[in-house]
Every structure is written in structure tokens, then in C-alpha cells.
Amino acid sequence: MIIVTGGAGFIGSNIVKALNDKGITDILVVDNLKDGTKFVNLVDLNIADYMDKEDFLIQIMAGEDFGDVEAIFHEGACSSTTEWDGKYMMDNNYQYSKELLHYCLEREIPFLYASSAATYGGRTSDFIESREYEKPLNVYGYSKFLFDEYVRQILPEANSQIVGFRYFNVYGPREGHKGSMASVAFHLNTQLNNGESPKLFEGSENFKRDFVYVGDVADVNLWFLENGVSGIFNLGTGRAESFQAVADATLAYHKKGQIEYIPFPDKLKGRYQAFTQADLTNLRAAGYDKPFKTVAEGVTEYMAWLNRDA
């Protein structure tokens, strides 16, 4: 069996899909379906079982057996960069991850987990997986950074695989439940389909991020499981492309619309990553050599998926 925490969420459900595509259906999805809309991410997928996150954590802490577990993909977390309840964030992202890590280490179960580019904070260069480059801007980034630091202490002694992926700006299918935290491509598509003007912040040609397609993210996760490599790795494309490029690809697909530029909100000033670009040196050195989709390629594929029933 393979366990996917956050399996009804954005990246988790895409990992489930990638496993299904390889013929793997013996999957336990762990999630919190208090937001009932997330079930739509699983309706076209095949899994063996579902368990609530709280029940799962109780069983993990009690050391209960889940049978022959081949791996745990730990994607379950609070991923809101605007959530400032630090106790909630540390319980949910840090403490929970530690419990799961030790469960896996004791049983030598491969543990593949979601870290984040938010660990780098407001940098504009050198997004490198090393302590001197890490300075998160928000409590979400701090919770991810602290767990990475915890993993670094354990890695030299670990007898089983531990791998963390610092996801950059992931976009693609199955993110509709994320609301305001969904990608710009998702929001632009919604605005166009609602007959509204698609909106970007003023200066969006200058805001550049490493936008990585979720299908590529899932592929990297599965490659690492198959190849057994440990470590903490950036997971982006290695390219920074502008929000304007995302909009251009969206409008090109829809063949309509004109961008309306809106003022940059004061509340985000100083807490907003204006530039991200993954340094892929370590990922490539680990042996992953496949190309990543460009914004034009990924957004076009995503638009086709979003509008498949149109």
C-alpha cells in the first residue's frame, strides 16, 4: 500500500493520479474533508481506502500497523501563506510531519514530503538548498523551513529514504478548492468564463516566478520513489517567467479578453515573493533529467483540462 496524506488536495490528488496511471490503486488517502468540495479531486481516481487526518494521526502516534506500506507521500499541510495562527501552523505542518517521519524511520518506510520555496523568503537570486539562503517571510514558510532543518539533522543517520521537495509556484488540475490560494492561471480562466476582464496586479510583467506544472511535480515524486534518492531538493523548472506570460498563454487559449491591471494591495507589500527561480543543480545531480513544461506549454494543457466540458 502507498499512503498519500493531503491526498484529496491539489498536489496529493495529482500524485494519486500519477500512481493510477502506473496501474497502482492500493492507495490510502488521508485528508481532512471538512471542506467537502475537495472530494471532486478524487472522483475520477481509484483508491483502496480513505481516512480522516485526525484518526490517522492517532493511529500513527499509537504505532498501529497499516500493513505492508511501500511509501508515504506527505502532502498534507496548511498551505496558506496568509495564515498567521502560528500554533495551528506549527501543529499542522511541523509536529504532524515529525510524528510521521519517525513512524517511517522506525519501519524503514520511504518518506517523501512537501517542503516549499517559501523557505527562501524574499530572495531575488540564489534559491539554493542551503541554510545561508533561507529566511522565510511568513509562518507557513517558517514551519516548512524548521521541518527541513529537523530532517537535515536526521538524514546522515537514516536507514531509509527521506526526501523533501521545495515546491515553487505549482499550478494545474485539481486546485479549484484552494480559493484565493489557487494559481493565477486558474483565476484568469474563471474570470474569462464569467465574462469578466481578467485581472493582474500592476507591474505583472516584472513579477517573475518559477511556475511549475503539477504533472511534472507528480512525475518527480514518483521518480524519486523509484530511485530511492534522499535529500532536500528544489522542485521548479529552473526558469522564472512573468505573470504576464501566464496571462498571455491563457488569453491565447481563449482567443479573447484584455487584461485589466489593478493596484498592488498594501497588505501584501513586504510579504510577497516578487521573484523565484529554482536552482536545479542538486535535482539534476540526483539523476532527474527530464525537461519541465514552459508556462506556454503547461498553461495551454491546463486550460484544455479546465474547459474540457465546455
Curated annotation (Swiss-Prot):
The record's annotation in InterPro entries points to: Epimerase_deHydtase, Heptose_epim, NAD(P)-bd_dom_sf
Give the species this sequence originates from.
Answer: Shigella dysenteriae serotype 1 (strain Sd197)
* This protein's name: ADP-L-glycero-D-manno-heptose-6-epimerase
Catalytic activity, reaction form: ADP-D-glycero-beta-D-manno-heptose = ADP-L-glycero-beta-D-manno-heptose
Binding of NADP(+) occurs at 10-11, 31-32, 38, 53, 75-79, 92, 144, 170, 178
- Active site positions: Y140 (proton acceptor), K178 (proton acceptor)
N6-acetyllysine PTM positions: K267
What the entry lists under PANTHER family is as follows: ADP-L-GLYCERO-D-MANNO-HEPTOSE-6-EPIMERASE, NUCLEOSIDE-DIPHOSPHATE-SUGAR EPIMERASE
UniProt keywords, alphabetically:
Acetylation, Carbohydrate metabolism, Isomerase, NADP
Keyword Acetylation recorded: yes
This protein's pathway reads:
Nucleotide-sugar biosynthesis; ADP-L-glycero-beta-D-manno-heptose biosynthesis; ADP-L-glycero-beta-D-manno-heptose from D-glycero-beta-D-manno-heptose 7-phosphate: step 4/4
Question: What is the cofactor note?
Answer: Binds 1 NADP(+) per subunit.
Record function comment: Catalyzes the interconversion between ADP-D-glycero-beta-D-manno-heptose and ADP-L-glycero-beta-D-manno-heptose via an epimerization at carbon 6 of the heptose.
Q: Where does substrate bind?
A: N169, S180, H187, F201, E202, G203, S204, R209, Y272
Q: Which NCBIfam families match?
A: heptose_epim, PRK11150.1
A Gene Ontology biological process noted in the UniProt record is: ADP-L-glycero-beta-D-manno-heptose biosynthetic process
Q: Which cysteines are joined by disulfide bonds?
A: none
Gene that encodes it: hldD
